[in-house]
């Protein structure tokens, strides 16, 4: 199994907080974005790769390829941040045997059909139930925009 240091749900994927805070907090040298649609968009792939700091490799994979990649043996000094837009992607990985110590919830913006839990997190019923199933499987999910903020267990947001 690959060495995953940070697993984050954030619908903006790579942006200022990820680049300036999370990558500086952890010795991350590889970002794996898991998104089926984005994996087919070569222009956006180039944009995301350009947004990463020097020395940080960005890989964009669909769910199927990411599952296989994450199950491979770790490489020496490979430290991965997994980024996804929605919790369903991580639930599928968990069901396939990929493990996560914890999941950090960043931003999930407001959209039609989503309930707002705080100023940065909104989720529809399917996403909310997915959060509950992940938590019930034994993986905690914490809301935290940047590492300097206190983690908030999302059980509090869901109740």
Task: Kindly give the residue locations of the regions a language model identified.
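Structural motif
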Residues: 3-7, 29-32, 57-59, 78-82, ...
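A general structural motif
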Residues: 10-13, 62, 123
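A generic local secondary-structure boundary/capping motif
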Residues: 20-21, 70, 92-94, 129-133
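Short, hinge-like loop/turn segments at secondary-structure boundaries
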Residues: 49-51, 77, 120-121
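Ordered, amphipathic secondary-structure segments that act as subunit-interaction surfaces
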Residues: 61-106
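Glycine-rich, aromatic-bearing surface loops/beta-hairpins
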Residues: 96, 101-159
């Amino acid at each position: 199994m690959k060495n995953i240091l940070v697993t984050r749900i954030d619908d903006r994927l790579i942006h200022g907080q990820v680049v300036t805070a999370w990558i500086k907090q952890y010795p991350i040298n590889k970002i794996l974005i898991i998104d089926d649609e984005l994996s087919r968009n070569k222009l956006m792939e180039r944009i995301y790769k350009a947004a990463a700091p020097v020395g940080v490799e960005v890989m964009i994979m669909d769910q199927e390829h990411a599952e296989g990649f994450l199950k491979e043996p770790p490489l020496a000094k490979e430290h991965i941040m997994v980024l996804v837009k929605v919790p369903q992607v991580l639930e599928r990985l968990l069901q396939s045997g990929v493990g996560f110590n914890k999941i950090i919830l960043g931003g999930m913006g407001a959209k039609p059909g989503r309930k707002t839990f705080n100023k940065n997190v909104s989720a529809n019923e399917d996403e909310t139930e997915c959060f509950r199933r992940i938590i019930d499987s034994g993986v905690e999910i914490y809301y935290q925009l940047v590492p300097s903020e206190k983690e908030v267990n999302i059980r509090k947001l869901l109740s």
